[in-house]
Amino acid sequence: MKRILYIVIGISLTACLTEVDLSDLRESPRLVVNGVAVAGEPLRLSVTRTWFYTDDHPNVVIPDATVRLYVNDHYEETIPFVPGDTLFNAAGSYQAAFVPKMADRLRLEVSAPGYEAIHAETVIPQASQLLEAKAVREVSTADSTVKRVVYSISFQDAVEEENYYLFRLEEGNLINEVDSMYSWRVLYLDYAEEPLFVQSTSALDQILFSQYLSGYDGRVFSDETINGKSYTIRLQTSTHYVSEATKRLRVRLYAISADYYRYLKTLQDQSDRSFANHLIDAGLAEPIRVYSNIDGGLGIFGGCAPNRMEVDYE
């Protein structure tokens, strides 16, 4: 009887197997362009192609693409491919002689043999206006063993414009007083303490998950609630030990294009601890689709104007 039972179980398990032909899901490869035009820096771009997830990570760099750059509706140059690229950690990248400036409107037209031609546009925004940066060491009123550093960064938002920003704080430890050399690290902060970063989260997330918002490499925000006003961002770090040595605070406030903001925002939303992501992890919701402004392809072509301020604190 037991032998018959094993046979029946084996037959039933075999019947549950279904072969899926993944080749039916394969699409024709498309061009992928990734690059951020930074005011004051030569334009650099990565041109690759899409690949199927069973392809075992092939080399997808496209070295023979034709990349034409237009600036303010005028042809500027055909950007050459330069082999070997430590910045992108790739076989090479497209490096232009052109250096964009604020308010420039850029357009890319990219084509390559065997692929559909694509194009993308972006605008370099005006740089942010940093007003003041401060860092103050404090002792917690609730627990005297807990020390913290409170950071206050003030800036002015442009009037009657939709503005988008990427904010990041770095801390430097003095390692060579003679040459004023610092060892820098990005500050790991909880952005949930600052209303400006909470504005883009849902009401449900603010109730359930307001205790933490990540952003090790910085966090993006818009001027939706502060349009045309001066504003002070307040954040803090808490620990049982805060070094008394003199440190340097570096504030980075990048003004970024709307498309670049939407792209970074989707990446940010993917990493946040949110109700939507819990549903996605449980298979109850569609994954967050990464934003792209490449017409006919994938990737991002963004614009950025950097600004920074450094202050010492003790």
Which stretches of residues belong to each language-model region?
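Sec-dependent bacterial lipoprotein signal peptides
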Residues: 1-14
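A sequence/structural signal for flexible, mid-protein segments enriched
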Residues: 17-314
